[in-house]
Regions:
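Non-catalytic surface loops within mature trypsin-like serine protease
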Residues: 49, 78, 107-109
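Compact nucleic-acid interaction/catalytic patches
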Residues: 51-58, 63-95
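C-terminal terminal-subdomain/extension
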Residues: 1-17, 92-141
Length: 141
């Protein structure tokens, strides 16, 4: 994961936090390294900071489903978190330094294919299953 400092919101390529998608989105695991982002893949996009949405940074996001023509994704962090809102994913190919990652379960981001900076990796099916279990416990279908 990149630890580069904050940067201003880009004219194109920023993700948007969405609410209430839990009942609309169907969780899906369908990675396909075809150059397009699919559920089960870790991608990178510009994510705004919570305290100042005009500033943010490129972050890894796990694509968990689709809502129409938009992807739905959850943010990863390399900083340890103990809260029930975070799921320990361990390390993966999305982090070149091999650091463990935590997935934020309480914030869903919507992004268009064109908003992606790059694709990172495919999450193993059993790890995606853990994500699905955690999200279904929160009302996802």
């Amino acid at each position: 994961m990149s630890d580069h400092g904050p940067v201003a919101r880009p004219a194109h390529g920023a993700v948007t936090q969405v609410h209430g998608v839990e009942r609309l989105a169907r969780l899906d695991y369908s990675p396909d390294l075809d150059g397009l982002a699919d559920p089960g893949e870790v991608v990178w996009a510009w994510v705004p900071f919570e305290d100042d949405p005009a500033v943010g940074k490129d972050r890894p996001l796990l694509v968990v489903g689709r809502a129409g023509r938009f992807l739905l994704a959850l943010m990863l962090s390399s900083k340890p978190h103990d809260s029930a809102d975070w799921l320990d994913l361990g390390s993966g190919a999305w982090d070149h330094d091999g650091r463990p990652s935590w997935l934020r379960l309480d914030r869903v981001y919507e992004l268009h294919e064109n908003d992606l900076r790059r694709e990172g990796a495919v999450l193993a099916p059993e790890r995606f299953g853990r994500v699905v279990d955690a999200l279904r416990a929160r009302g996802w279908r």
